[in-house]
Amino acid sequence: MQRGYVLCNYDLSQVLCLTPEKDGVVLHDVTSTKVLNKAMCLPDLTEAKNVSQMLQDKDLTGDLEIVNVARLYKKFF
């Protein structure tokens, strides 16, 4: 179980994860806690904002929301 902040879409149905090669990012549907365990989880809000801005500047992602991963785990527990 992770803790910290993740980047997800506005309806909280997809979460940002690293690709298996760890050279890019992809949005995965939040269907189980296994997906949340694979999510790119950042320890603090400042770091999450910096990563979000960097990804937007490089046009790798669109607008994403920063949420506490515990909020997503509540869907399953």
What residues fall within each predicted segment?
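Short aromatic-glycine-(Arg/Gly/Cys) micro-motifs in beta-strand/loop hairpins
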Residues: 1-38, 64
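Short, mixed-charge low-complexity intrinsically disordered segments
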Residues: 36-77
